[in-house]
Amino acid sequence: MNSPKDNPNADLAYQKTILGSVSRTFALTIPLLPPTIEKVVGNTYLLCRIVDTIEDAADLSPSSKQALSKLFLDAVLEKSPVNTFVEPCLSALKNYSNQDELDLIIHTPTVLRILHTCSIKDQAAVSRCVSIMSDGMSHFHTKQTQVGLKDLQEFEQYCYVVAGVVGELLTTIFSNHSPQFAQRIRGQEGLAIAFGQALQMTNILKDSPEDKARGVSWKPANVSQTELLCIAYQKLEDALRYILLIPKQDIGIRQFCFLAFGLACMTLSKIANHKQFTHKDELKLSRHTVIAFYGFTKIASSNDALIKAFFSLSTRSLRKLSQP
């Protein structure tokens, strides 16, 4: 029997399988990318999911989360052997209920082996992203309160370290593989941050009832839901501009971004139409809606007019909130 190191196909098969287990959305969107980009983006998502799992562990103190985050980052940056992270992390998460995420942590060596088969440029971009996210989350571990983050500035910073930086990473990887996109995005890299932040704001608003139940809020204190939805709409406008900069010949990249963007638009619109909700399942898009929109992206991703029309129609309720 081959050792894991001799079987890169088995590693990639694991990456594909676990991606489907830990994220229905990204299991749908990531395979739309060209194969070389699909591998590194899928790999990055799993690394970020490990960071996220540490953050979500309600039983752990902020100092324990910070210690585990540092061990993980050291393993990613090859400063220490990966088992110096895996063993203490599994021990700390012995009461953690999500078995798929625990399995992902067990397979951290597999995920890192895949990372090291990517190009040097892509590896550098991933390491930067995971470093900023891990350090940023460690900083925010000490700010977990029921009241929420201090102000909008702190909220923006949180959204940057958990998602804006992913927008930057995607832009770097897309640019590494598409010289035309690299040329078009030059000077407008801030749109990439807004793209990531729009997706993160969607998650924060959607997950707020569950966060509240475990004594945490990632929303800024003393800022209304309406104001947050207006900010999210502005981020979506920038995200739209980002998507339209992607060359039509890079159709897989366009479709990947448009699918994630569209699901966020529809979810935020549902939030805008629900004055009160007690569980994120109330905002969940139906399977039929997701499949129908997936089919629509295949038609619309190369058509700027259709993308703009979708945005205009799907965000009417958000736009009303933004109007005086």
Regions flagged by a language model, labelled:
Residues 1-199, 205-324:
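Catalytic cores of Mg2+-dependent Asp-rich isoprenoid enzymes
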